[in-house]
UniProtKB/Swiss-Prot annotation:
InterPro entries: NA-bd_OB-fold (IPR012340), Ribosomal_uS17 (IPR000266), Ribosomal_uS17_bact/chlr (IPR019984). Part of the 30S ribosomal subunit. One of the primary rRNA binding proteins, it binds specifically to the 5'-end of 16S ribosomal RNA. Belongs to the universal ribosomal protein uS17 family. This is Small ribosomal subunit protein uS17c. It is found in: Plastid, Chloroplast.
Length: 145
């Protein structure tokens, strides 16, 4: 029997016990593999150490009892070889080989987000352009003296 789930990239074959009544999902727990995140995004909170930045990563997780999503913050140490980041910068953490006891990520700059507002990206509405025309005083025609 094949087990398909959105959490596994390929179907997993599960050995059933024929008609014994055992659940086909019983052996699936051992066949699934959980992988750690390869890249995270966070904000630099400290730059005191040389070639190291402290990055705070915020994620949403459900509360065990109340099921309401809550913010969970975790701080990672990341390698910054050029000391280029400042406190408040948003960086991407990429998993790498262990650099020290606590550093397992490399800090990479993110491209700046587009700061233009939606109103600047879209053309004005027809009603907005007419109201702007009415607000402007009429310009006198050029005199031909």
């Amino acid at each position: 029997m094949l087990l398909t789930t959105p959490f596994v990239s390929s179907p997993v074959r599960v050995q059933g016990n024929g008609g014994s009544g055992a659940s086909p999902w019983a052996g699936a727990a051992t066949a699934l593999r959980i992988q750690a995140a390869k890249q995270l995004t966070g904000r630099v909170v400290t730059t005191k150490a040389d070639k190291t930045v402290g990055v705070e990563v915020v994620r949403l997780a459900p509360h065990p009892k109340y099921k309401r999503r809550e913010r969970i913050k975790k701080k990672y140490q990341a390698h910054d070889p050029d000391n280029q980041f400042k406190v408040g910068d948003v960086v991407e953490l990429r998993r790498s080989r262990p650099i020290s006891k606590t550093k397992h990520f490399l800090a990479v700059p993110l491209p700046p987000r587009d700061t233009r507002r939606k109103s600047q990206l879209l053309p004005p509405l027809q009603s907005q352009s007419q109201s702007q025309d009415q607000d402007q005083p009429p310009t006198p025609p050029p005199s031909s003296d």
